[in-house]
Amino acid sequence: MSAYAEHIKTVCSRFDKALEDNNFESVLVYSGQPRVDFLDDNAPPYRVNPLFKYWVPVTESPKSAIFYRKGSQRPTVYLFQARDFWHAPVNVPEEEWQQHVDLKIIDDLSMLTEDLGSDLEQSAFIGEDFAQPVSDWRVKARNPQALIDHLHFHRSIKTQWEVDNLREANRLAAKAHVAAKEAFFAGKSELEIHHAYLGAIDFRESQVPYNSIVALNSHSAILHYDVYDTVPPKQIRSFLIDAGARYRGYCSDITRSYAYEEGFYANLVEAMDKAQQELLSEIKPGVSYYDLHVSMHLKVAQILSDFEFIKGDAQSIYDKGYTSAFMPHGLGHFIGLQVHDVGGFLKDDKGNSYERSERHPFLRLLRDIEVGHVFTIEPGLYVVDQLLEEHKDSADINWEKVDELRPYGGVRIEDSIVVGADGNENLTRDAFKELGAE
């Protein structure tokens, strides 16, 4: 059986259990449609419903839908192909997935409702329903949270087909990262580096899974920086790039940091890279991701001590809360159909969830690690003045050292990890190794 055949079998089984547990006979998953801007007739780029592309690798077909009846083991895909002379038709090439579904081409949503008849009224509807006629459809329930929670909990365990797609997404992004790195060392501006990244993989800006972070010098301290200066700085010091790609609807999310010259910042990047790789060896089924996060904070604390940013040993630096000022974000998150993939707070498929940590409120993943999980590991260290204000009177902090780092901004390194029963796969580093880049 092919990887996709196994995948759709798994998806059918997961939907069967979710529908059974929540008293639904069937479900209609709507792909979504563009939403025009306020007082305008233009729409931002369309993003498909993740639960639609969970079934089939179709990401550019708005107004389409998937109907699945519990126990049928075969979904019906209503693929919308508009009779439209204004736009290019949606290109859906013949692929294996079409052998595992009943495919029906429609050019009007009334064709879907007529085909389903009374089945529609017995279905759970999952998707956006802001526009007619979808908002007028009579369905049993719209976006029932219990059903969605059930599906989201199990989406954390990736099928082999999903891992294969994530691997390809990392290969694409690694290729683009290499081009961006070359542009950085060639003295290009942030915008030029951004263009080099997109050009290396022939992506439009709307095709990357999130706004790429392309940050030179002190901009690296802005966690979600996406301004892109058009002129390079007079003195180039550092480069942080956080950017991904998509393949068949699956996302990659890679961060790398580079020093323009050898010295203090280059040593800091090397230390963070070493600490990150040490943490990777701690990833095992049954380990709490929260405990991994704390372990990384202790490693960051050791770096703060080793580089004389803060006086004291690693444990005392962590206990006093200093690491949260230098690494305010979480260690990572699930990744898959979405960059910040779902289910990170769910305890079970009944919707019970973990409370966010008071000490680490921005951590997006609190579950114990399981075989089949795919998540990012992305430690960082930055000069964020807003966060350092709380410690402005601290005698423990070596402010001269902080000032030395300030023009470099910060450092972050991010890989995606597949958890296996007999060892883990680093999708990101493997992709760079294939290119001879790491």
Curated annotation (Swiss-Prot):
It comes from the Bacteria. GO terms for biological process: proteolysis. Binds 2 manganese ions per subunit. Its cofactor is Mn(2+). PROSITE patterns: PROLINE_PEPTIDASE (PS00491). Mn(2+) 2 binds at residues 242, 253, 414. One of its GO terms (cellular component) is cytosol. Mn(2+) 1 binds at residues 253, 333, 378, 414. It is an enzyme of class 3 (hydrolase). GO terms for molecular function: aminopeptidase activity; metal ion binding; metalloexopeptidase activity; phosphoric triester hydrolase activity; proline dipeptidase activity. Pfam families: PepQ_N, Peptidase_M24. Its EC number is 3.4.13.9. It catalyses: Xaa-L-Pro dipeptide + H2O = an L-alpha-amino acid + L-proline. HAMAP family: X_Pro_dipeptid. Belongs to the peptidase M24B family. Bacterial-type prolidase subfamily. This is Xaa-Pro dipeptidase 2.
